[in-house]
Swiss-Prot record:
SUPFAM superfamilies: S-adenosyl-L-methionine-dependent methyltransferases. CDD domains: AdoMet_MTases. Pfam families: Methyltransf_9. The gene is cmoB. The keyword Protein biosynthesis does not apply. Gene3D superfamilies: Vaccinia Virus protein VP39. InterPro entries: CmoB, Mo5U34_MeTrfas-like, SAM-dependent_MTases_sf. HAMAP family: tRNA_carboxymethyltr_CmoB. It catalyses: carboxy-S-adenosyl-L-methionine + 5-hydroxyuridine(34) in tRNA = 5-carboxymethoxyuridine(34) in tRNA + S-adenosyl-L-homocysteine + H(+). It comes from Citrifermentans bemidjiense (strain ATCC BAA-1014 / DSM 16622 / JCM 12645 / Bem) (Geobacter bemidjiensis). This is tRNA U34 carboxymethyltransferase. Homotetramer. The keyword Transferase applies.
């Protein structure tokens, strides 16, 4: 596991000494939650990564680390094999020393949709809830964010972040293996809070909104992306079983209902800034994610429905302010 000493110092400088102490006591134990065989494989792959310095780093328009000229052909083939040890790669894409890591999601498309609508990130402290492997965190740093903390309970995603961090060596971007429920309430120290693709997995969506609000300083901005359904303020869809083969989808609101939830939780300046029906081009199986993907989750005869007959995934991005 990464050495988080820089993170502890940064949190203490933000007035969060107690949280830094809690993390220092609990993060080392998180590794025990993953099987020894999996962790051993990841650690072996991590240790086998080449000791080279990237000739270029690009985070503004892409996430590009190094170039193909930094490696010989044999080293590149070995690097690709080591990267595949961290399969499946879900969030990206990354250009890694000339290797195109074509992830399941075109997360860059989502970033392009939301960036024009949010407060400028330059100089801001950001927490990204359910951040996956930290792809959007790198884009936030590229957009000028001063400090980015990603929280992600799945250790494989954290390990993928560490692969990139090994070469980017960015002391202002961290991903730690915790969930939002482990974040102390009412921190009130972040300028921007991102929660993308998380809300519908929460059994209590309003509690999740209050948790996000507690992370924000007064005047801070929430950026929330979630599944939605068409309807009015009283329309909330609760799947009777699976949704798009997912077991853990609980509540999918309409835009109007989501707006009402945000109002009831005390947010202001609420806006739905984007809606997008997920396409097979944006979410699909690739060489880097060889399991089922969106095409397998939809009705083969009607792409407007999931395999269970529910409305196909429609996503919306909301922005709101903590007064």
């Amino acid at each position: 596991m990464s050495n988080y000493d820089a993170l502890y110092r940064q949190l203490a400088a933000m007035g969060q000494e107690r949280w830094a102490e809690q993390l220092q006591a609990t993060l080392p134990d998180k590794l025990a939650l993953e099987s020894t065989a999996k962790m051993a494989g990841w650690q072996s792959a991590m240790q086998s990564l080449p000791e080279i310095s990237p000739s270029r780093i690009e985070l503004l328009d892409t996430v590009t680390i190094g170039s193909s000229d930094d490696l010989g052909q044999v080293d590149r083939e070995e690097l690709m094999a080591h990267l595949q040890a961290f399969h499946p790669w879900r969030k990206g894409p990354y250009n890694f020393f000339g290797i195109e890591i074509d992830t399941e999601w075109r997360s860059d498309w989502k970033w392009e949709r939301l960036l024009p609508h949010i407060q400028p990130l330059a100089g801001r402290r950001v927490i990204d809830v359910g951040c996956g492997n930290g792809y959007h965190g790198w884009r936030m740093r590229g957009a000028g964010a001063e400090f980015v903390l990603g929280i992600e309970p799945f250790l494989l995603s954290v390990q993928q972040f560490q692969v990139m961090q090994r070469y980017l060596c960015d002391p202002q971007h961290h991903v730690i293996p915790i969930g939002i429920e482990e974040v102390p309430p009412n921190l009130a120290c972040f300028d921007s809070v991102f929660s993308m693709g998380v809300l519908y997995h929460r059994r209590s969506p309003l509690d999740h909104l209050f948790e996000l609000k507690g992370c924000l300083r007064p005047g801070g901005e929430l950026i929330l992306e979630t599944l939605i359904v068409e309807g009015d303020r009283e329309t909330i869809f609760m799947p009777p079983g699976r949704y798009a083969k997912m077991r853990n989808v609980w509540f999918i609101p309409s835009i109007a209902a989501m707006t009402l939830w945000l109002e009831r939780c005390g947010f202001t300046d609420i806006a739905c800034v984007d809606t997008n029906r997920t396409s097979r081009e944006e979410q699909r199986s690739t060489e880097w994610m060889r399991f089922e993907s969106l095409a397998d989750f939809l009705d083969p005869d009607d792409a407007q429905k999931t395999i269970e007959g529910h409305p196909a995934p429609l996503r919306a991005i909301f922005t709101a302010t903590k007064p």
